[in-house]
Amino acid sequence: MIKDYNDYKKAVDTLKKWAYYYYVLDNPLVTDEEYDKLYHEVEEYEKKHPDKIDPTSPTQRVGDVVLEGFEKAKHLSRMWSMEDVFNEKDFLDWVGRVKRILGHENFSFYIEPKFDGASLNLIYENGKLIRAETRGDGEIGEDVTLNAKTINSIPLEIKEKSLIEIRGEVVIKKDDFDKLNEERLKNGEPTFANPRNAAAGSLRQLDPKITAKRPLIFYPWGVGVNSLNYERYSELMDYIYSLGFKEPPKRGVCKDIPCVEKKYDEFVKLRDSFEVMLDGMVVKIDEIKYHDILGYTQKYPRWMVAYKFPAIEKETIIEDVIVQVGRTGVLTPVAVLKPVEIGGVIVERATLHNFDEIERMDIRIGDHVIVIRSGDVIPKITKVLTWKRKGDEKPIPRPTHCPVCGAEVLDEGALIKCQNLSCPARVVNTIIYFASKNCLDIEGLGESVAKLLYEHGLVKDVTDLFELKVEDLEKLPLFARKKAENLVNAIKSKVGVECWRFVNALGIEHIGEVASKKICEKFGVEFYKHAPEEFEEIEGFGPEMVKSIAEYIRVNKEKIEKLIEILKPKNPEKKEVQKTPFTGKTVVLTGTMSKPRSEIKKMLEDMGAKVSSSVSKKTDFVIYGEDAGSKYDKAKKLGVNLLSEDDMWKMLKEGK
């Protein structure tokens, strides 16, 4: 019986310990009955003394608030995607790239399972869980703190007091997934397609009480912002697990490639027997000092890959082939399949890529084929079982005319294009893309509405969206006045949209969200007034990207200007740069320094320096730390100014 606050605190600590052993270590210390008894005693004390409730008490995991929607939440540091490798050759190619960048092969690999769930970012400050965010687009997610607190394997309090982002995957056991679907069937509710959908859907419930009923598990796999000082990723993760998080099986360190391949084989064998869904193995360079040297592409860190499991394959029949027309006019053949279940998902369609591929594989309607599905990759046909042919299979001819507008197509071999800019499919898909989440994000303007607007002659180009009137929309099927007003207001609200969203919405080939942000940071809204060679200066922009931008601007200059006049996009806020000896200079960092290189890089960039990854005659300074390598030698050879890290700090202090 709890008599006073001291008894209460002891009871809470005991409950925390029991919960940790049960949910994290899978090693219960007491019976469920004993746990429930103490839990209810703690609850009773808290009801009588609401002013003395410990916020980290297990009873506080579930709140009574039902949200109207989720607030957007900006991650303290970006949550990157991961490059996928699907076989030994792909993996060896990645290792080869790492060796080339580092200039040696003195590194090891940290290995861990790749869970097939929903990514979550936890932020702890002063040891308390202050926020939990979904991955979102990698920079901005949704605040799901109340739901995350209901997951028993997420500690509400940790011993690490510094600000830290702990990242991981929310998953559900396969058995629990089956039980959940059985329950939903009984209640007449739609079932979840697979455990990942169940985990993601449970995490995004507006009522935390529903999330609390779902047996979700959280496995950490990394960190974002942190002030930890570890030399190896494996040591860093050892520390994270010591904070009270659930540790996955089979993680470890490999010194060489044969060890990695052996681990991969072990994971493949573990795949079916493991309690939650795995879709591969994550391989990271263990030495943290090499992470900054390896750097990042526009999407991925170069120091890690997801070594995916072999795809699951099934046999089925091609019942038909339809041809889709994208916003760029490319005709893509898609196989309509006899429905087949692959890895818990019903597959009814598979990409055929292009008509050259159809001819190469001799694919016909009516063929028995092998279809594979791997992770998020669109299902595809890998083999035609020609020996099962009966003679009534139909060849698939190359189209000579667009299946949507009837215009003659341009056949370039692998690509067949409809060149009619007014083709309904091209126009509708352009509108859908323009309004999509990572572009203008116009609420209520999805595929069905875009088709309606086009079919009723209200929109022939994205610029027409801004001429829409409530009275015109009211005449459309299923458009009541309120819905019409909402759409018009949603479109009008995009005036003053961020520059990068505007550029991304233009749909320039090879230019996605990350590239759009770089264009806006460099040139702002008037990017279209700059010469092609100026785009070459942007880090990561290759010849194809530059050519694509130049061609788009040449053809669409008037349209860009009209949209700018309508939307008045906002340029990124320019940070006020304090004048330093490095302002406007090109700098290269090399060697091990007293602070993480990423920190020094950001500091220099905030001062207006351009921090490059390679040394050339245009480099102003090479700043070196301990064990400086080939960049130091190259700078010496080219006569580039060499500064030790101490010299850098001295120059900053003296301001010269």
Swiss-Prot record:
Gene3D superfamilies: 5' to 3' exonuclease, C-terminal subdomain, 6.20.10.30, BRCT domain, DNA ligase/mRNA capping enzyme, Helix hairpin bin, Nucleic acid-binding proteins. One of its GO terms (biological process) is DNA repair. Pfam families: BRCT (PF00533), DNA_ligase_aden (PF01653), DNA_ligase_OB (PF03120), DNA_ligase_ZBD (PF03119), HHH_5 (PF14520). The keyword Ribonucleoprotein does not apply. PROSITE patterns: BRCT, DNA_LIGASE_N1, DNA_LIGASE_N2. Keywords: DNA damage, DNA repair, DNA replication, Ligase, Magnesium, Manganese, Metal-binding, NAD, Zinc. Its cofactor is Mg(2+); Mn(2+). Its EC number is 6.5.1.2. NAD(+) binds at residues 32-36, 81-82, 112, 135, 169, 284, 308. InterPro entries: BRCT_dom (IPR001357), BRCT_dom_sf (IPR036420), DNA_ligase (IPR001679), DNA_ligase_AS (IPR018239), DNA_ligase_CS (IPR033136), DNAligase_adenylation (IPR013839), DNAligase_N (IPR013840), Hlx-hairpin-Hlx_DNA-bd_motif (IPR003583). The active site is at 114 (n6-amp-lysine intermediate). One of its GO terms (cellular component) is cytosol. SUPFAM superfamilies: BRCT domain (SSF52113), DNA ligase/mRNA capping enzyme, catalytic domain (SSF56091), Nucleic acid-binding proteins (SSF50249), RuvA domain 2-like (SSF47781). One of its GO terms (molecular function) is DNA binding. It comes from the Bacteria. It catalyses: NAD(+) + (deoxyribonucleotide)n-3'-hydroxyl + 5'-phospho-(deoxyribonucleotide)m = (deoxyribonucleotide)n+m + AMP + beta-nicotinamide D-nucleotide. CDD domains: BRCT_DNA_ligase_like, LIGANc. Belongs to the NAD-dependent DNA ligase family. LigA subfamily. DNA ligase that catalyzes the formation of phosphodiester linkages between 5'-phosphoryl and 3'-hydroxyl groups in double-stranded DNA using NAD as a coenzyme and as the energy source for the reaction. It is essential for DNA replication and repair of damaged DNA. This is DNA ligase. It comes from Nautilia profundicola (strain ATCC BAA-1463 / DSM 18972 / AmH).
